[in-house]
């Protein structure tokens, strides 16, 4: 086990490095409890995450398992049926891209997703098709996509499991052709009795493709716990360098290292 000491002034909570000895952690807790601490550094960085790629068979099987608990075999069987029903393109592919000559088709499919996917609004379609085009990365078959026929037929006649799979493929097309997710990462360093404590936070600046992922998750997925939205990680404002945190409350916590798998 190892220990950490956290300090809080009621708004901002900062935490120490890992401390190996419980006695040492307890001493630090006593030393800082009720005293004042000072903000020594505030570091802000702009970060970005690019949209995901389209699905090949392996990545789709992995995601169908993560979101719906389907086995790889079950996903393949359903994809095969959807392919025979002309609802999806060829499933046994190892490419996550499409070819240059498909640009117009893919653009049309992406734009049609607003009517096809019940959880999407028209403002969420960005259509950055160039992101998913790469002739060199398509050998025999391109990435898995919904078909024009699927959009014409709609999902009315499908089982709920096949619907899930088709919606997963559709939303991935919208994500992959979407905007980057931009956020500001802030790290606040605080000193108390010559010991350093830190707090890290994230503030979304542009949700980009993540907006689609969250809409899909809320609509389809019962698993609400896996990825909490980032706004929970927002730090309180007003903590600039030199600010004093008066009469902080210090607490010690115990942590356990996970055994090797």
Where are these regions (language model features)?
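Core catalytic DNA strand-manipulation module of type IA topoisomerases
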Residues: 1-261
């Amino acid at each position: 086990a190892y220990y950490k000491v956290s300090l809080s002034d009621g708004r901002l909570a900062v935490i120490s490095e890992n401390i190996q000895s419980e006695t040492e952690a307890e001493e630090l807790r006593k030393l800082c409890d009720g005293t004042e601490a000072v903000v020594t550094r505030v570091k802000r960085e702009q970060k970005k995450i690019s949209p995901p790629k389209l699905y090949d068979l392996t990545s789709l099987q992995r995601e169908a398992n993560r979101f719906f608990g389907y086995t790889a075999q079950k996903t393949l069987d359903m994809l095969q049926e959807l392919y025979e029903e002309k609802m999806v393109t060829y499933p046994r592919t190892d490419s996550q891209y499409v070819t240059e000559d498909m640009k117009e088709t893919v653009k049309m499919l992406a734009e049609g997703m607003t009517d096809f996917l019940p959880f999407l609004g028209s403002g969420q379609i960005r259509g950055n098709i160039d992101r998913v085009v790469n002739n060199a990365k398509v050998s025999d078959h391109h990435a898995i996509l919904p078909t024009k026929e699927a959009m014409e037929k709609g999902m009315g006649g499908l089982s709920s499991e096949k619907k899930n799979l088709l919606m997963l493929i559709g939303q991935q097309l919208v994500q992959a052709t979407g905007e980057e997710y931009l956020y500001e990462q802030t790290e606040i360093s605080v000193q108390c009795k010559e010991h350093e404590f830190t707090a890290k936070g994230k503030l979304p600046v542009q949700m980009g493709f993540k907006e689609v992922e969250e809409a899909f998750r809320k609509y389809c997925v019962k698993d609400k716990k896996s990825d909490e939205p980032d706004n929970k990680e927002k730090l309180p404002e007003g903590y600039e360098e030199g600010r004093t945190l008066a009469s902080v409350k210090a607490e010690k916590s115990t942590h356990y290292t996970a055994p090797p798998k």
